[in-house]
Amino acid sequence: MQGMALNQLLACLKWLGEFQVLACIPLKGSIHARDVADLTGVPETQLCRVVRLMATAGFLHEPRPGQIAHTVLSGAFVTDLSLLDAGMFLSETAAPVALHMATATERQSDLQASNSAYSVAFNTSQPFEAACVERSRLHRQWSAYSRCAGDAEDKTVELFGQLNWRSLGSATIVDSCAQSTDLVLELAKLYPSLHFVVQMNNAAAVQQEACRRPESEDVKRRMKIQERMPSAPQTVKDAAVYILRLPATLRPSAVQILAELRAHLGALRANSSATLILATPLLPEPGTLDPDSEARARVRDLARLQLTNETDLELSELIELVNGVHDSNGRFRVVSKLRSRDSAATAALGIKYQAVPTAP
């Protein structure tokens, strides 16, 4: 019975969003259902039925018969539109895709993105990532859904706080897959001797970040911003640390991670004392998180499988991936592991290049 109720609640949330009902209800006070029905063009009787079901979940309520008012929960969907975007993605995309997982499995001859549950649900050969690029609304909703699911904001900043940056003196740090300068600006304020190179894969983003005014001229002097395309060979060869953080919204695949590792192989080979810090969201190993946190992580993992036919990596799989990167002179090896103090799903690996001893 609870599952049936959740199904109807999701359908009602989609209905409210589709007809922009929530925006017609004042954040304070109430409004007559008839007025809302007139504004949105929906039948008043259906509106009342939807509101009364949602009220059982604390979303909207009737202070008096025929009157509609917001609760704290429903009001948040008006003041923070990303919540509504997330709800619409859940109802319009995530739910129907999940229901087509069995059909997709029956039809799959391989795990190409074009054979995903998403492609079955919407009868398309276009991969989900490509659809997000073309359709701004879908991309916005997916980003909002990812943030609400705890996807977009990982624990990498906390992880980096565990490192002994002061021991590096006036060394150069490269943030090689940056989405913004936020992390580097924070580190630059804390460690006034360090120098930074921020590499972004979008020329417009580079220009935008370059126009941001640092808090001091000293920080500006110690920070360079440059463009670097995904998987392009690392050209900065004299850094002490390379930070490799891949975007978390569309979580990186093993292929993407491997390509970035190989792109940094030459830089670490040229400087054996340099360290590459690989930070990426991971699927927690069974039983390492509390049940609610593990459930959220596994919901995200299954949603990713259904949308893209990609899955999250566990820590052991990530280490195996790193250990497989090599050239004729040596290979990568993991020299340290960092864990978030409150999330086994976030980790960072310290990686160095190990030369192969030459035969006498």
UniProtKB/Swiss-Prot annotation:
Please verify whether the record's keywords include Transcription. Answer: yes
Output the Gene Ontology cellular-component terms: nucleus
> Which cystines does this chain contain?
none
Q: Where can this protein be found? A: Nucleus
Q: Which domain of life is it from?
A: Eukaryota
Mainly resides where? nucleus
> What InterPro entries does this protein's entry cite?
SAM-dependent_MTases_sf, WH-like_DNA-bd_sf, WH_DNA-bd_sf
Arranged from A to Z, the UniProt key words for this protein are: DNA-binding, Nucleus, Transcription, Transcription regulation
Q: Which GO terms describe its molecular function?
A: DNA binding
- Segments forming domain HTH iclR-type: 3-67
* Database matches in Gene3D superfamilies: Vaccinia Virus protein VP39 (3.40.50.150), Winged helix-like DNA-binding domain superfamily/Winged helix DNA-binding domain (1.10.10.10)
Q: Which residues bind DNA?
A: 33-52
Q: List the induction conditions.
A: Expression is up-regulated during banana leaves infection.
Q: Describe its function.
A: Transcriptional coactivator; part of the gene cluster that mediates the biosynthesis of an emodin derivative that may be involved in black Sigatoka disease of banana. With MYCFIDRAFT_198930, coregulates the production of the PKS8-1 cluster product.
- This chain's protein is named Transcriptional coactivator MYCFIDRAFT_190109
What high-level taxonomic lineage is stated for the organism? Eukaryota, Fungi, Dikarya, Ascomycota, Pezizomycotina
